[in-house]
């Protein structure tokens, strides 16, 4: 294991569940994220909430040297990436312990190491 590394914690949520839950649930979740950020400020190196998947634009190569630009997410799935945190941790185990604290009541998180220190 490396001495200290950076990890991307990607937050995936089901937008339909959030829509059904309404603004009070969203506001409560924002508060939980603020609390998470305050409790883990020593490890956080960045993070942000992303716009809804309906605002996404995907770019794919067309196989002829050009590109195809389409509205929508790259992959069509029920859960979409709604935000992320960049964290610094001693190792993957520590990163996972931090990631377990990320509020994600309508989905979950995925943790990946940043290659070559970012």
Listing of model-derived features with the role each one plays in the protein:
Residues 1-118:
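Conserved, structured core segments of small domains
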């Amino acid at each position: 294991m490396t001495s200290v590394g950076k990890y991307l914690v990607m937050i995936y949520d089901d937008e339909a569940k959030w829509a059904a839950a309404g603004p009070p649930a969203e506001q409560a979740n924002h508060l939980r994220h603020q609390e998470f950020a305050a409790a883990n400020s020593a490890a956080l190196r960045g993070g942000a909430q992303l716009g809804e998947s309906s605002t996404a634009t995907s770019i794919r190569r067309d196989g002829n040297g050009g590109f195809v630009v389409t509205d929508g997410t790259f992959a069509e799935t029920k859960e979409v990436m709604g935000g992320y945190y960049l964290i610094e941790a001693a190792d993957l185990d520590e990163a996972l312990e931090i990631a377990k604290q990320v509020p994600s009541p309508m989905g979950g998180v995925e943790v990946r190491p940043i290659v070559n220190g970012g």
